Amino acid sequence: MAHGPRYRVPFRRRREGKTNYHKRLKLLKSKKPRLVVRKTLNHHIAQIVVYDPKGDKTLVSAHTMELMRDFGWKGHGGNTPSAYLLGLLIGYKAKQAGIEEAILDIGLHPPTRGSSIFAVLKGAVDAGLNVPHSEEIYPEDYRINGEHIANYAKALKEEDEALYRKQFSGYLVKGLEPEKLPEHFEEVKAKIIEKFEGARE
């Protein structure tokens, strides 16, 4: 381990790989709410957060478990379609709470073009939340609606049905054929829009 009078011990959260303080400072200087997006192996989480000296305050939040519980989503919580739907949900929640704009905070996630993190961003923007961005970072539409998953499932079923049933058991046990994921995506998307757009009327 390095030592000496010029050696500085990094902040604990930086050592633990939880916070990039240089990036955080740049975000805080904007003085705007942050659209915080985080990804785990099986889920996505989104929050609208504002800075407070005593600790960040979460104004609204959404989790892919909500998609399953409240809107009947039967797909995986960690894929691109669920990320977009989560973005749509957090965007509508933010608008409902009177939040019109935010800046994206992806933490230590690498800013990979077309990643599911940016699918959350697209969903939030489509819901009407103003977030500075470049559309070039969005995933392609066929990935957002799950067409790539459906095509893979169709091909796998024809080639090896046993492997198909094993790999997509999570879908099948919920009564969803993965080949029909794009249609299911549109159904759940419509439910989210109806809940919030209908409430305005």
From Swiss-Prot:
Entry GO CC: cytosolic large ribosomal subunit
InterPro entries noted in UniProt: Rbsml_uL18_euk (IPR005485)
SUPFAM superfamilies: Translational machinery components
Signal peptide: none
Record-level GO BP terms: ribosomal large subunit assembly; translation
GO MF entries: 5S rRNA binding; structural constituent of ribosome
Family: Belongs to the universal ribosomal protein uL18 family.
HAMAP family for the chain: Ribosomal_uL18_A
Quaternary context: Part of the 50S ribosomal subunit. Contacts the 5S and 23S rRNAs.
PANTHER family: LARGE RIBOSOMAL SUBUNIT PROTEIN UL18, RIBOSOMAL PROTEIN L5-RELATED
The protein's name: Large ribosomal subunit protein uL18
Originating gene: rpl18
